[in-house]
Amino acid sequence: MFRRYADTLTSEGFIRIVIHAVGRMKAGPERELADRYLDRAAKAGPAIGMELAGVSEIPESRARSTLERKREEGRKLLDFAQGGALILLDERGKNLSSRELGDRFASFRDSGFRQIVMAIGGPDGHDDAVRAAADLSISFGAQTWPHQLVRVMLAEQLYRLITILSGHPYHRD
């Protein structure tokens, strides 16, 4: 399933942001909150050259072994990331401030990348091949978070970093 938040194709000087998540997010308050932040990000992003393209949900692998599940899901994530900056949400990733994350997004945009792929792994995490291919790996802290909350937190951080880069007062230091 792919939920689109922007109806335009990426134009010159814009970078597309797309989220690929292993697993489905069921209807409920978490999905509503994530959609609310993603909609805000989609509306605010074009002013600073960022377009939120949408969210793709990748079915969880049904393979028997953990290793094979991670590999199968990882191959799909890597296929989607071709030609773009790949940012993983991973418990082993860097713990960046919102400003630091905004700076990284601006750097990808200004370096000529046309797409940023945000990858959320399945219950078993990311395959080592995906970790090795990532341009950046970030964490929302040392704790383990439920998939639904990670999606909400990512949506809010995307909106927040867009407001930081645009000078909007939503974020306060």
From Swiss-Prot:
It is found in: Cytoplasm. Its main location: cytoplasm. It comes from the Bacteria. GO terms for cellular component: cytoplasm. S-adenosyl-L-methionine binds at L89, G121. Gene3D superfamilies: 3.40.1280.10. Its EC number is 2.1.1.177. The keyword Cytoplasm applies. It catalyses: pseudouridine(1915) in 23S rRNA + S-adenosyl-L-methionine = N(3)-methylpseudouridine(1915) in 23S rRNA + S-adenosyl-L-homocysteine + H(+). It holds the Pfam family SPOUT_MTase. GO terms for molecular function: rRNA (pseudouridine-N3-)-methyltransferase activity. The keyword Magnesium does not apply. Keywords: Cytoplasm, Methyltransferase, rRNA processing, S-adenosyl-L-methionine, Transferase. Belongs to the RNA methyltransferase RlmH family. Homodimer. Specifically methylates the pseudouridine at position 1915 (m3Psi1915) in 23S rRNA. This is Ribosomal RNA large subunit methyltransferase H. It comes from Chelativorans sp. (strain BNC1). The gene is rlmH.
